[in-house]
Structures are given as structure tokens and as C-alpha cells.
Amino acid sequence: MDLKNKKILVTGGNGFLGKNVVRNLENLGVSDIIIPSSSDCDLRNMGNCKKVVDGIDVVFHLAAHVGGIGLNREKPGELFFDNLMMGTQLLHESKMANVKKFIALGTVCSYPKFTQVPFSEDDIWNGYPEETNAPYGLAKKMLLVQSKAYREQYDFHSIVVIPTNLYGPDDNFDPSSSHVIPALILKISNAKKNNLDQIEVWGDGSPTRDFLFV
């Protein structure tokens, strides 16, 4: 699909990944890019979802309520509800508005807690996610189910991209919600500034993770 003359919606376009997606779209010559702000367009509201996809050709759904271990432990209900509502309503209203392509961002947190390492793409249905991440991971996982169902019944063109853990410039360094790499960078930076000889790192060091630089 040639994107140059398409009207493109990027939810979460002001976020860490979204800024990079918008920059790349601009480099491809796309000029009509809509980036709604969460304060003006709450995607948990179905009416807002309906309005924001009106006249749109392609949707990149990158908006999410997301954070690190601390946030997942503190607000599992919010993470489940917010991400489920945003995703399922936006996809549905995109279908209703005859959007030509819907690209959603999934999460590696949807994969089972117990699986072989390295795991394959097909392993996503082979078990329950790690309990701390399960509300967020399962809410995102439902986009896979909905995408397949809408493709089969309505021939709606949607895909769910599941990257590994992301990091890079413009990442979230808020200690209450950041992921492991920015959290460690901040802890080490603060320790150096305050002449501390140690930092607190969660876990026992045994988990294996992979990361993707954005």
C-alpha cells in the first residue's frame, strides 16, 4: 500500500514508539497524519473512537496504559480495562468506518509464563502469562482474537505486531512506571550523583529477556 496520499491515524503518536513511527511516516512522504492526545480524545469512550477514525485510511494503534512491574502490581484493574476498551472499541469503529488497514501494537507480555527459551511465535497460546503482567498482557492479547474474528467475518484488514521489550531515546524514565532499562539507567545515574555504592535491582537475576532498540 502506498501511504503517501493516505490519511493516517497514529494513536499514542506523542509517546516513545509513536514519535518514531510518525517520524518514519513523514520520511515516507506522508503529510496527513492525525495524532490525537489522550486529554482531548479518551479512547476508552466509544464515541471518541468513532469520531477519531472518521475519514481515516490507515490506523496505527500504539496508545496504551503501560508501565513496569511497579505499575502492574499497583493498578492491574486499570491496565486491563483501559487497554481492553481502547483496543477493542477502536478496532470495531475502524471496521465500521471502512478503514483500509488497522495495525495494532501487541505485547510480549501476552506470552506464557512457562515456555521454552527461545520461544516461537506460535507459543503465545500455550499457557497463561506471568501473573504480574497478565491483566495487561491478556487485554492486548484480545486484539489478536478480535483481529482474526473480524478478518474472518468482515474481511477487515488488521494485524497485531508483537515486538519484544523496547528501549531507546524518549523512553519513560518515571520510576513509578518505567520498564527495566530506563529504570536501571535512572537508578545508576542517581547513585552516581549521590555517591552511593549500590542500587536495588528487583528479582534474582535469573530471568532471560530480549530487547529491541527504537
Where are these regions (language model features)?
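NAD(P)-dependent short-chain dehydrogenase/reductase
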Residues: 114-123, 145-214
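Phosphate-coordination loops involved in phosphoryl transfer and adenosine-cofactor binding
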Residues: 4-5, 99
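SDR active-site strand-loop-helix element
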Residues: 11, 36, 59-65, 102-108, ...
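Active-site helix of classical SDR
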Residues: 135, 139-142
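NAD(P)H-binding glycine-rich loop region in Rossmannoid oxidoreductase-like domains
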Residues: 46-83, 93-96
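Conserved Rossmann-fold NAD(P)-dependent oxidoreductase catalytic core, especially the SDR/UDP-sugar
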Residues: 88-133, 159
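N-terminal Rossmann NAD(P)H-binding glycine-rich loop of SDR-like oxidoreductase domains
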Residues: 6-26
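Adenosine-cofactor binding site in Rossmann-like domains, unifying the SAM/SAH pocket
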Residues: 31-49
